[in-house]
Amino acid sequence: MYKKIGIIYHPLNPAACDLAIKLAAKLDSLGIENWSDSAWQADKLTPKMQNTQLILTTGGDGTILRTAHAILPLEIPILSVNLGKVGFMTELSPEDAISGLEKVLAGDGWIDERSLLEAEYLPHDSAQSRQFFVMNDAVVARGQVARVICVSVDINSQPFTTYKADGAIVSTATGSTGYSYAAGGPVLQPNSADIILTPILPHLGRGYSLVLPSDSIVDLKVNTWHEATLSIDGFINMQVSSGDTLRLRQSSKKIQFIRLRPENYFYKGLDTKLKGNNESVYDR
């Protein structure tokens, strides 16, 4: 039995906020300790994770990404309600939220584990490095000036290539349906631990993606006279400089989702989702 449950909602989506209130009321009626907070309040979320046994999210995939970063390095399962549009990671419709929660509280469902990456940002000037978890993707890209940058890629300490491009994406299987897919990358089965390397609009045609085994270590080194950026999962963003390196490898940690659908659920509707262009602002 779950003794403490957290509810994380998209603060700018009124329907997500309303549903969070209803879920909290349901838990109150069952005598289950619970708390609620905005997905955009990472500094408040992380301390609340201690002793929390289940997280409910109301929002889109972006809400899940922010929630995952607040949970890590703990491994607390997520039961997600889709208040966005596409919802590659979400599980329940708003209409099924209460009944789905009741099923999970009764012991139904299975755990869908997703692989993560660990990223280490290594500044060229020997300043202190920074570490991040990556659930979807890490992107090294040009800044606001519309000029290509050079990104040198090493794989397992061996030089692979230098992209002269808008940037490069290193993606997990979970992130394979996102930016990497838009840049021409493949879609991987969700429980794959493989790593995808995809250039962004490369100059002179070196436009293929590479699927790497899970034990690979990928270094992206920036070489540019212009502004460049690093983005982790689309919401951790920072400027980077020429000579800076981003090193990525498989993490020992996992993100856990509770699923009520069959284990082959991913393929149902996948083609429709990939062809769709109906993203809501609340997916972000």
UniProtKB/Swiss-Prot annotation:
Q: Which GO terms describe its biological process?
A: NAD metabolic process; NADP biosynthetic process
User: Is this entry keyworded Ligase?
Assistant: no
Q: Where is the active site?
A: 61
The cofactors it requires, by name, are: a divalent metal cation
> MF terms per GO, please?
ATP binding; metal ion binding; NAD binding; NAD+ kinase activity
Alphabetized InterPro entries for the sequence: ATP-NAD_kinase_N, ATP-NAD_kinase_PpnK-typ_C, NAD/diacylglycerol_kinase_sf, NADK
Reactions mediated catalytically:
NAD(+) + ATP = ADP + NADP(+) + H(+)
User: Enzyme group, top EC level?
Assistant: transferase
Matches recorded under Pfam families: NAD_kinase, NAD_kinase_C
The compartments listed are: Cytoplasm
What EC number(s) does its UniProt record assign? Answer: 2.7.1.23
Q: Report the function annotation for this chain.
A: Involved in the regulation of the intracellular balance of NAD and NADP, and is a key enzyme in the biosynthesis of NADP. Catalyzes specifically the phosphorylation on 2'-hydroxyl of the adenosine moiety of NAD to yield NADP.
- What HAMAP family would the database entry show? NAD_kinase
Q: Which family does it belong to?
A: Belongs to the NAD kinase family.
Q: Please state what the protein is called.
A: NAD kinase
Q: Which gene encodes it?
A: nadK
